[in-house]
Swiss-Prot record:
One function term, GO molecular function aspect: G protein-coupled receptor activity
Gene: MRGPRE
Recorded GO CC terms: plasma membrane
Protein name: Mas-related G-protein coupled receptor member E
Organism: Homo sapiens
Entry's transmembrane regions: 21-41, 60-80, 107-127, 142-162, 177-197, 218-238, 242-262
Family named by the database record: Belongs to the G-protein coupled receptor 1 family. Mas subfamily.
């Protein structure tokens, strides 16, 4: 964010690095293809969760994650177009800066939501009685709204301190805010990994040791997906803005992995919820991926309607 130019600045840069242009174009083309697939997948998840799937707390989390990934991929695909066209197309500075800031904003939102849903799923597994009886009804909605609001505040502070949107940028304040963002990223990663580890230990220490399935299994797979595919983008972005040294090839690698991270989530949802040897509608597949809670909610709703019909 300290440098508005992002796309196109690495290809052919005068830093003495020997780049294989053909290899870079292949990586960028793969990134665009994965981004397009991710847009379709997250769009399907967004549509199904907002219209067809029974609303439960975890579905609301996935709805917000899909929304953040959808915006991220849209900005991601547009931002690398100048690299893909090898400088034949260039964006104005304010467009590049807007794409960069919006992309990091959605990245932090998605990571924060993953940490929140990991903690809530861990609490549901460790304290099932308390979770069923004492959990505030609108906790998920409040957590999601607060996450978007706090990430938007960080986004505005970084935009004000590091760009010329709101006046002259302050280099010292900008670096301080990026250090805060780095600490936030580390805390979110530790929280997410700690909650997932406790959830895994809880499942393994159960009486029959069943394999993680349903929504707990989905959370564990999503966390692993972030650590291997989503984290490199955050490391690159923070290193770039804090002027830390990073290998030159890490630029294309982190962008490709970010596209893999967002595009693979819908695949994980649908694969985990699909039944072997059976063809199910996407709505039922996604409902199965949400786990027993969604199915229990649907059963309760059906039972309540049956009682109403009998009483009538």
């Amino acid at each position: 964010m300290m440098e508005p130019r992002e796309a196109g600045q690495h290809v052919g840069a005068a830093n003495g690095a020997q780049e294989d242009v053909a290899f870079n174009l292949i990586i960028l083309s793969l990134t665009e293809g994965l981004g397009l697939g991710g847009l379709l997948g997250n769009g399907a998840v967004l549509w199904l969760l907002s219209s067809n799937v029974y609303r439960n707390p975890f579905a609301i989390y996935l709805l917000d994650v899909a929304c953040a990934d959808l915006i991220f991929l849209g900005c991601h695909m547009v931002a690398i177009v100048p690299d893909l066209l090898q400088g034949r197309l260039d964006f104005p500075g304010f467009v590049q800066t807007s794409l960069a800031t919006l992309r990091f904003f959605c990245y932090i939102v998605g990571l924060s939501l993953l940490a929140a849903v990991s903690v809530e799923q861990c609490l549901a597994a460790l304290f099932p009685a308390w979770y069923s009886c004492r959990r505030p009804r609108h906790l998920t909605t409040c957590v999601c709204a607060l996450t978007w609001a706090l990430c938007l505040l960080l986004h505005l502070l970084l935009s004000g301190a590091c760009t010329q949107f709101f006046g002259e940028p302050s280099r010292h304040l900008c670096r301080t805010l990026w250090l805060v963002a780095a600490v936030l990223l580390a805390l979110l990663c530790c929280t997410m990994c700690g909650a997932s580890l406790m959830l895994l230990l809880r499942v393994e220490r159960g009486p029959q040791r069943p394999p993680p399935r349903g929504f707990p299994g989905l959370i564990l797979l999503t966390v692993l997906l972030f650590l291997f595919c989503g984290l490199p983008f955050g490391i690159y972005w923070l290193s770039r803005n804090l002027l830390w040294y990073i290998p030159h090839y890490f630029y294309h690698f982190s962008f490709l992995m970010a596209a893999v991270h967002c595009a693979a989530k819908p695949v994980v949802y649908f694969c985990l919820g699909s039944a072997q040897g059976r063809r199910l509608p996407l709505r039922l597949v996604l409902q199965r991926a949400l786990g027993d809670e969604a199915e229990l909610g649907a059963v309760r709703e059906t039972s309540r309607r049956g009682l109403v019909d009998i009483a009538a």
